[in-house]
């Protein structure tokens, strides 16, 4: 199994990307990793090249680049070359912490979309209070969605939760403004009806306030609503940890209490760190494409590689294709 990685994408590239990739190559004996990027910048951080190769690419798609134009014009960029490795069959999956829009464009134009999937969906796995987490899609690949798209998202999320996360019968929830069957706009009402007709374990509408309670294993939404919910969760978590830090450093007594609570607080922070689940999978493409967070460190890249490896090993893409054929 070979996993291609854009070594130049992300805030901490290439150092953290290379460190995470090297750790994964050392940990998983059944994978090879291809790092794509400026070889002169990659090599200083690569201590052990066992099962790791480098493809030199002298262009980088920047965060400020217009996604589609960048993919079309920067043919020798690390991201485009990475996607080409997958398209040509030399890599089984790919990972980038770079420009999200450009990665989606490279996924669509280079890797290609699964026949029968109308639109891809960006799907991170987010933490829940019970420690199990849930798959959330779409969080921004497409701002709008038709009811049929939401039904496809549910199918892809179901396959991922079952094949990779080991959930025998994943609970599917539809993000809405209330839990009653007739809540929402025409899109969510129609999507609700379509999901009820499937063989999926559809539990109905779920509200944003219940997501971290573990109300569902897979939650589907249009990209606009999903992205707003995701950013709200991220912002709330950051604000709470910041407030907690201020409180626990406000006095000598508070600092003593913080010292006593440090192991518990560290465990809480780790539990709510969704980089432990890997990156956001771009579902609907012909191979696993993983979007790692732009601020990814070596640990996040390691888990993104683990995630890509599990998607390939469990044939998530093949299973999605088979399910589409079965239900068409």
UniProtKB/Swiss-Prot annotation:
Superkingdom of this protein's organism: Bacteria
Gene3D superfamilies the record matches: Isopropylmalate Dehydrogenase
Principal localisation: cytoplasm
GO BP term, pick one: phospholipid biosynthetic process
Entry GO CC: cytoplasm
An MF annotation (GO) of this entry: phosphate:acyl-[acyl carrier protein] acyltransferase activity
Cellular localization per UniProt: Cytoplasm
Pathway: Lipid metabolism; phospholipid metabolism
Protein name per its UniProtKB record: Phosphate acyltransferase
Similarity remark: Belongs to the PlsX family.
Organism: Geobacillus thermodenitrificans (strain NG80-2)
Keyword Lipid biosynthesis listed: yes
Reaction catalysis annotation: a fatty acyl-[ACP] + phosphate = an acyl phosphate + holo-[ACP]
Subunit structure: Homodimer. Probably interacts with PlsY.
Enzyme Commission identifier(s): 2.3.1.274
UniProt-listed Pfam families: FA_synthesis
Entry keyword set: Cytoplasm, Lipid biosynthesis, Lipid metabolism, Phospholipid biosynthesis, Phospholipid metabolism, Transferase
């Amino acid at each position: 199994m070979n996993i291609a990685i854009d070594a130049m994408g992300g805030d901490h590239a290439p150092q953290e990307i290379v460190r995470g990739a090297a750790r994964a190559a050392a940990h998983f004996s059944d994978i090879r990793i291809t790092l794509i990027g400026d070889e002169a910048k990659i090599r200083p951080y690569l201590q052990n090249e066992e099962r790791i190769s480098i493809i030199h690419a002298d262009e980088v798609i920047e965060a400020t680049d217009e996604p589609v134009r960048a993919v079309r014009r920067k043919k020798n960029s690390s991201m485009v070359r990475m996607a080409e490795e997958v398209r040509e069959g030399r890599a089984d999956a790919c990972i980038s912490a770079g420009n999200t829009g450009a990665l989606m464009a490279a996924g669509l134009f280079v890797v290609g979309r699964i026949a029968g999937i109308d639109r891809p969906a960006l799907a991170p796995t987010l933490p829940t209070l019970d420690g199990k987490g849930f798959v959330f899609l779409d969080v921004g690949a497409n701002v709008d969605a038709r009811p049929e798209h939401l039904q496809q998202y549910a199918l892809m999320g179901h396959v991922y939760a079952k094949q990779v996360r080991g959930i025998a019968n994943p609970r599917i929830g539809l993000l809405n403004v209330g839990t009653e069957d007739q809540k929402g706009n025409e899109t969510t009402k129609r999507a609700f009806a379509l999901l009820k007709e499937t063989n999926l374990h559809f539990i109905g509408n779920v509200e944003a306030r219940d997501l971290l309670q573990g109300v569902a294993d897979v939650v589907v939404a249009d990209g606009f609503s999903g992205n707003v919910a995701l950013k709200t969760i991220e912002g709330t978590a950051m604000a709470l940890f910041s407030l907690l830090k201020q409180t626990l450093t406000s006095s000598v007594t508070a600092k003593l209490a913080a010292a006593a609570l440090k192991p518990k607080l560290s465990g809480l922070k780790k539990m709510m760190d969704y980089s432990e689940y890997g990156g956001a999978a771009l579902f609907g493409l012909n191979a696993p494409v993983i979007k790692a967070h732009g601020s990814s460190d070596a640990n996040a890249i390691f888990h993104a590689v683990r995630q890509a490896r599990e998607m390939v090993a469990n044939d998530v893409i093949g299973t999605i294709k088979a399910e589409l054929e079965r239900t068409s």
